[in-house]
């Protein structure tokens, strides 16, 4: 009876169910009726319902579309509808409707969407309350885990699983081949479920949900539901958003379905296989541009390709090769996919067992494509290609065969023809690329190639890596240190060792702490550890060497090199190079303070020196000819500061006796007999380092030997016959030994004071004696000796006296340095005599023993040394410095001796530290040495002033900054590199606004322009002449390029806002000044300033990185943070456009009129500049130039002409390349360094190419016509017969009208000149 009542209510509800409130009862009654087991009632129901099927479908569809109760009513209606279709004896095709099926799918989507907390309230609140208890029962697990409640915020997970399970069952007998829209909607809905279900992952068994979705999608991949290929294509399209999303379960589901289900079905279905092979290509087209999502897309593509068959993989590789020639977004995807393909797919270099492996290799094509993309116009693509090529090199360097093929592919094999040297040239360009990311990637590639090549690299690449160690960016410097250290780690050739030592140790002075630490680490590993290993293996090696008494010097050198492995001799020799030793000292000091120096290093160095001596003696060579390996004593002197207990006194005492007894003059006489050269400078250097070592370990020496050594040193000092380098070492060692000899510090000071004053007194007597001798000889009128031998002896005596006086003066300075409080009152007069000799206006003429000759000419060494010693005395005595500073400045300015000027620069910069306020007025005179004719003086001045500026002893003000600019274009490459590092790294951090504040002034100064009323110099012509030294005057190409190089360097230091401000300042202070008459454009320097301004405004460095229509990709910062970057780009573009319209364009219009009125040649430069400025605003030129229609027309014409010329040039290149290819000529490996990718340029290039081909054909016809061949008779030519106007043939004579038409045919003119 209840079933009868339900049946009646359902039928009544269908007939009058137009109200949405009746749908709930209808759905509930229908579900209750379908749950009954009475077949008779159900058959009656089906019969009654069939007569009103349309009304029923309308009502049930409306219920499934209902948003009531947050979609719960709709999902209950869907459950009831599916239960109806699944019930026994149900007339399925009567009750199945595409519209109702679409409503069912919509109800599933809406039920899974995010719910609002307030949903279901209002008019339905009572119904919610009434059903709460009913829905809130603890329903157990059909669809979720651990028996948790089946709902959360109104979501019933169990109900959802029931609906999906019934949907899958319905699809087994309801075929959708007749309903393509329903099939499409089903695929889309099921593909969306993994994403929509994320909000309910807490109450859903997500894995089971994915399994059910996979079953539904797999079920429709059946011929019963239509064409499988079309269905698979629709599924692939619908799963694409999941495949392209980040790491998530939904993405894993999509990848699993495609790589397993689709791939398994495609094996036996050619049409389905075609769909599957096209899916990765479709994903490539849909891949996003931002870096991280693009990476996920690449991973998805690779997973699908890996699951494909070999044929499909090969087809996709060919597709990737074509992508490399496409648009920028495809090219960047291609370079990201290639390394993954090579590392994931099998046999990239062909079958190892096949003899024709190279022919079957698809990997070589990929490598070649990567190499080509390393020269792409997009910096992002260049950087990605270089870094990915580095990954490929690392992956393929595993076995010997792969290494050999890879070397051949990259052009490193002598046997390869094409591409030889291409990668080397490529690396040289990319390591100095304008984009930092490209330089970093290039250095990474160099590091990987170093391992491949075993460190044997072209010298230019090594120098490029060394130069990169001075890059302005920290990351580039780190990469460069890593790259060149890897080369040195693998290869110990002399060229690699030398370049490493000249590039890496200097990084100990870097501002970045991490780079300093890396420098210490690699020095410890590659220098000290290598020396330590060499010391450990010496004994067995030396024992194995043959003992040959008839040994030449070359054989001995060879034996010594064989004695020390890993190029240790070259390493030690370069360590004591004057350009390397200061950094080695700094590194050893830093390692020593951190207690990282191992005692075994000192023992190894002693072992190296001992074994070298033993080998020398074993060849029966005279011991007085022996010298230790170059650099060994130097490094021992540096490490012994912190390893004094590891150095043996017997060892030092033995070698001191050897070096001290060497008589250079006597040895020179025996040199020819022994066939070995004698190098006295080597002994002097070794003695200095040995004395330094003795000083370092003096506190460990026994008392008696220390006293004996001190007496010996004092005697040698007082003889004044030492080399200047040895004097300092002797003096310092003697001071240290005095501390050892004395029991207290006061006693030690008294001992030092005693021998310092004793030595100074003797030195002053020697100097005075020489001066008096020179003066008396100048007054002597004795007839010169006629005998040559007597004259020679006399000259030799004078030379020895001069040498002794020079050493004496130098010794005084050394003594003053170690004991500043020494009494110098008796020494100053004699030094004053020397440095003022020849001056008739000397103030002390009657008080001091003046030299009657000019010692500057008679004894230049003594003259120079006296200035140096006086400088040391001034450092110890401020009052003395105050008296003599004017003399130092005067001599620095007037001296014609480069060595003296160099020493004076050193002295003056030392004064800057000790007497900062006193020396400030002399800074301009010091900076003049930046333009000194001697390179050494210029470099020394630059380095010393740079250090003072970094330590704030000198300020960047006045002319100092402007004079430093000239070092950027110095003739010396070393100075240019130092200047680039100063401006690009140090100054950019220390004074970031300096380039901006001084930019306009720099333009006037560099052009030596005084034609501006605001920049004119009121001083005399003499000051202008002085300023000319620091200018680059002239309008020639060389001068302009030098100035432009300086401007570009300054622009690179500016922030974007400063570039905008600089643009405005140039327009206001130069262009506007010229149009207002403040800048005289008839003056040559004024014209140069104006032309420079035009060039600067048109250069790319002053333009901001985000321009109109430009893509968002850059190399340094990829597309991350796209919204912020886009907003910033719009703001910058708006600011530039506003500035152009309001400020720049009116100035240009006024200035153009002025230049035209004066017939100035600068009009062309102005037009070129304006064309470059407005090329990004082609569509707005009419609006911008509304005030000057003529200028508007001229600019449009110039732009069109420029673009046409550019297109014609590219077309000519393309035609030439095509011709050479047809003629069998090999194409360039890198094709083109500049692949222009402009939106409108491609069509113009195609059009121009067609014109070029047609013109070429026309020229060939003209050449044949002009070749002298006579025109054949008309009867011999194959031509159609002509009839007269009357229809009668005129006996072989052509009609007059036809001849006239031929006369009027168009003439082809040769345009070879175009």
Curated annotation (Swiss-Prot):
What biological-process terms (Gene Ontology) are attached?
cell division; centromere clustering; chromatin organization; chromosome condensation; meiotic chromosome condensation; microsporogenesis; mitotic cell cycle; mitotic chromosome condensation
The listed locations are:
Nucleus; Chromosome
Keyword Lipid biosynthesis assigned to the entry: answer is no
Q: What induces it?
A: Regulated in a cell cycle-dependent manner with an increase during G2 phase, highest levels in the middle of G2 and a drop during mitosis. Induced by MMD1.
InterPro entries, per the entry: ARM-like (IPR011989), ARM-type_fold (IPR016024), CND1/NCAPD3 (IPR026971), Cnd1_C (IPR032682), NCAPD3 (IPR012371)
Residue ranges for motif Nuclear localization signal? 789-796
**Gene3D superfamilies listed in its UniProt record:** Leucine-rich Repeat Variant
Q: Which UniProt keywords apply?
A: Cell cycle, Cell division, Chromosome, DNA condensation, Meiosis, Mitosis, Nucleus, Repeat
Summed up, the tissue specificity of this protein is: Present in buds.
UniProt GO cellular component terms? condensin complex; euchromatin; nucleoplasm
- Renumbered residue ranges of the record's region Disordered: 116-150, 1210-1237, 1265-1314
One Pfam entry for this protein is: Cnd1
Q: State which residue ranges cross the membrane.
A: none
HEAT repeat ranges are 20-58, 98-136, 184-222, 231-267, 269-310, 331-360, 361-398, 417-455, 457-493, 494-532, 821-859, 878-916, 917-954, 956-992, 1053-1091, 1138-1179
- In which residue ranges is the amino acid composition biased (Basic residues)? 130-140
Record note on disruption phenotype? Dwarf plants with small rosette leaves. Reduced pollen fertility and seed set. Lower chromatin density and frequent (peri)centromere association in interphase nuclei as well as impaired sister chromatid cohesion. Altered interphase chromatin architecture in differentiated nuclei. Defect chromosome condensation in male meiocytes and in centromeres orientation. During meiosis, extensive interchromosome connections at metaphase I as well as a slight reduction in crossover formation.
Lineage: superkingdom: Eukaryota
Q: What's this protein's function?
A: Regulatory subunit of the condensin-2 complex, a complex which establishes mitotic chromosome architecture and is involved in physical rigidity of the chromatid axis. May promote the resolution of double-strand DNA catenanes (intertwines) between sister chromatids. Required for plant vigor, fertility, chromatin condensation and sister chromatid cohesion both during mitosis and meiosis. Necessary to maintain normal structural integrity of the meiotic chromosomes during the two nuclear divisions of gametogenesis, especially to prevent interchromosome connections at metaphase I.
What is the protein's quaternary organization?
A: Component of the condensin-2 complex.
| Protein name as it appears in the record | Condensin-2 complex subunit CAP-D3
State the taxonomy lineage. Answer: Eukaryota, Viridiplantae, Streptophyta, Embryophyta, Tracheophyta
